């Protein structure tokens, strides 16, 4: 399969995983390894250097040099807060990669498009590699691309809902128009949904809740890895066209033409 490229960096896996909701750092690490993900997100609100478990979680990730740690700004409510969080992350974690999340509504956690665009413009100016989480809005995604975002990350459904690709028609347009990688983020609840996103032409998917709340998270991580690989292979193989009428795979020409 073709490798994923983001901001000049190559990734062997098209499955990104989050680190929230796991019962322990041991389980989180086992999931990351089973997924074979090369991009792992961690919420900045959980990062307090010297605090113990969160530090342990981060150390579990960074001891695998093949994995890129992607801090995210989950919990911030404005561009100003996002920029402050980004600078703290760069200092604490020594990375300029950032998953930008700005969602002021604590109930639905939907991203604020205006503040996200403002934050992206300023963070790019400051030298960050910005991966913004956004509504599945094709116009907004083009503005973010023009502002210098390294990817766009439209939601499939609200965070943690496991409802799947409720925004699929808008995602199709975003994929068609985008000149930067499109990563489907939020709402994916089953491996089949991840495969569908990849078949549509998404460059990657990010999954957290669907793995973390599974009865067997490690096996679920493996299932998502295989689904993402299968979906991408199907996309690269070029799916057949959808028809409204039947077309025989074995034509009846000369069938039982006996003399």
Swiss-Prot record:
E.C. code: 2.8.1.10
CDD domains: ThiG
Catalytic activity from the UniProt record: [ThiS sulfur-carrier protein]-C-terminal-Gly-aminoethanethioate + 2-iminoacetate + 1-deoxy-D-xylulose 5-phosphate = [ThiS sulfur-carrier protein]-C-terminal Gly-Gly + 2-[(2R,5Z)-2-carboxy-4-methylthiazol-5(2H)-ylidene]ethyl phosphate + 2 H2O + H(+)
Entry annotated with the keyword Transcription: no
Record-listed 1-deoxy-D-xylulose 5-phosphate binding positions: 160, 186-187, 208-209
Segment forming the signal sequence: none
Metabolic or biological pathway: Cofactor biosynthesis; thiamine diphosphate biosynthesis
Transmembrane segments: none
Keyword field: Cytoplasm, Schiff base, Thiamine biosynthesis, Transferase
GO molecular function: thiazole synthase activity
Assembly and oligomerization: Homotetramer. Forms heterodimers with either ThiH or ThiS.
Task of the protein: Catalyzes the rearrangement of 1-deoxy-D-xylulose 5-phosphate (DXP) to produce the thiazole phosphate moiety of thiamine. Sulfur is provided by the thiocarboxylate moiety of the carrier protein ThiS. In vitro, sulfur can be provided by H(2)S.
Protein name: Thiazole synthase
Organism: Porphyromonas gingivalis (strain ATCC 33277 / DSM 20709 / CIP 103683 / JCM 12257 / NCTC 11834 / 2561)
Gene: thiG
